[in-house]
Swiss-Prot record:
Chief location category: cytoplasm
Record localization: Cytoplasm
Source superkingdom: Bacteria
Keyword tags: Cytoplasm, Ribosome biogenesis
Any one annotated GO CC term: cytosol
Keyword Cytoplasm: yes
Protein name (record): Ribosome maturation factor RimP
Keyword Cytoplasm applies: yes
Function: Required for maturation of 30S ribosomal subunits.
Protein family per UniProt: Belongs to the RimP family.
Disulfide bridge map: none
One Pfam family, short name: DUF150_C
InterPro entries: Ribosome_maturation_RimP (IPR003728), RimP_C (IPR028998), RimP_C_sf (IPR036847), RimP_N (IPR028989), RimP_N_sf (IPR035956)
Length: 215
């Protein structure tokens, strides 16, 4: 992943190479149907697999949403044809132990444990594990999980130095993620004027649809 800019992309962690080209194709499609891109990744496992990770603006993503995104982006990919070989299209939600790709993600998940890799050396390291203590406008403050002898207990990492950050699965994260998801779903139902039925406890907005597409 890289921080190469693209028009209309508010992510601080972005793709490079063929992944970046695919992201440019699918992002306008996603915005047009009310979704935002989290990540694009083309891998060579089991043939070629194109993973598109997306979510709604409120952070939710259902199985039906995955199917809608798959139906919407497939024609755009057929027209631009960025992948020369046959591949499987896999659309999924970010999941609970999600990657953090926007400044707003760091704000939303402040207080939770993350693993972070940087593109340059920061405080004599390129890998960090700790809690997000503060998410500012230009950087994020990480409270180290286990500071080595002589290291400061916290480190401030500029956003433009971050190569990848993922949440680490913990009991606190699961509880918080489910609470945020249930609240977002209820608010969405209220906006649509639908009955405010309770979302079953433990339900996750994590679903994947696989679609095979010939180049």
């Amino acid at each position: 992943m890289t921080a190469t800019a693209s028009e209309g992309d508010d992510r601080i962690i972005r793709e490079s190479g063929i992944d970046a080209r695919i992201a440019l194709i699918v992002q306008p499609v996603l915005r047009g149907i009310g979704f935002r891109l989290v990540r694009v990744h083309l891998s060579g496992q089991n043939g070629l697999t194109l993973q598109i990770m997306a979510e709604r603006e409120d952070g939710t993503m259902t199985v039906e949403d995955c199917e809608e995104v798959s139906r919407a982006v497939s024609p755009a990919l057929d027209v631009d044809d960025p992948i020369e070989k046959a591949y499987h299209l896999e659309v999924s939600s970010p999941g609970i132990d999600r990657p953090l790709v926007r400044k707003s993600d760091f704000v939303t998940w402040t207080g939770h444990l993350v693993k972070m890799e940087t593109s340059v050396i920061v405080a004599d390291r390129k890998r960090f594990k700790g809690k997000i203590a503060e998410a500012g406008e230009n950087d994020v403050l990480i409270e180290r999980d286990k500071a080595a002898y002589g290291e400061e207990p916290t480190v401030r990492v500029p956003y433009d130095a971050i190569a990848e950050t993922r949440l680490i699965l913990t009991d606190d994260l699961i509880r918080d993620a489910l609470s945020k998801d249930n609240r977002a779903r209820k608010e969405a139902k209220k906006r649509r004027g639908e009955p405010d039925d309770d979302v079953p406890e433990g339900a996750e907005a994590d679903a994947t649809e696989e679609h095979e597409q010939e180049s």
